[in-house]
Amino acid sequence: MKHLLKMSDLSPAELHHILDVAEELKAEQKAGTTPALLKGRSVALMFSKNSTRTRTSFEVGVYQLGGLGNYMNAATELQSGRGEPLKDTARVLGRYYDCVVWRTYRQCDLEEFAELAGVPVINGLTDYAHPCQVLADLMTIRERRGTLEGQKLCFIGDGCSMANSLIVGGLLAGMRVTCVCPEGYRPAADVLMFAHKYGEKFHLLTDPAEGVKDADVVVTAAWNTAPGTPESERRLRDFAGFQVTGRLMEGAKPDAMLLHCLPAHRGEEISAAVFEEHANEIFTEAENRLHVQKAVLAILLAGL
């Protein structure tokens, strides 16, 4: 693994290795024996979008592993926000830092940056992919279930970055994946081409009740990210009936897990009651962002 830009960068073996290392690092942190695997290493945390979990978990993770993490707002603190070409920023930061984490908009910009930087680059979220979040989801499921193989995962929501990454990651991990989206909100075409190679292990549906039937894990994410706008009003109409409620969860297995990448918009993609019922799973999922990202850093920079 040279970079982590999207889930399809990983082989099944590499994916499971990340989870294995994450579990080891989590146990070591709980025991107070975290190794200084990044001693003398520096990581640029470049963010073009706001962030709570991604920024803080990377900052804390780099620190816990003995490295230096520098946060920078790409829009207001770097010359790239004033028009400096991306290729120049990449070639400069690659000479200062051992690794760059970038949260940005366009996947093509991230991939161009990775080609030029000369150091490992990690996707902190683009409009196309959210691999760090999905690795945390898979870790959380494996901790609870003991295995990912054969588990039925149902994603309900917008077919954007979370759906794209969950589909690929779940299938690579040996899961059965169902994606439920309204018409007009399908996952990326290349992701669907990848998924259909897995035959009956993948289903794309528009009916949430059909999708959650006998699911081991249900995952949702916010789909109304610009409240008060015409786009928001359209989405509220289009996603009517896609809220994860207690009644919907009755169609899943009795012990089904429910995950949410956060932030959660209660009353939209998830009901407040269901969120609180599954809050421990959801916040364990959020905690596991720290551990999987430490694992990715340790693999890329310390050769684990």
PLM ranges: what are they?
Residues 42-43, 47-96:
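Active-site cofactor/substrate anionic-group-binding motifs, chiefly glycine-
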Residues 1-56, 60:
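Positively charged, low-complexity intrinsically disordered leader regions
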Residues 70-93, 116, 166-169, 186-200:
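Active-site-proximal loop->helix
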Residues 196-273:
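Rossmann-like adenosine-cofactor binding region
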Residues 255-256, 261-304:
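Adenosine-phosphate binding glycine-rich loop
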Residues 48-60, 143-221:
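Glycine-rich phosphate/diphosphate-binding loop of Rossmann-like nucleotide-binding domains
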Residues 81, 98-169, 260:
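Anion-binding alpha/beta catalytic cores of soluble intermediary-metabolism enzymes, centered on
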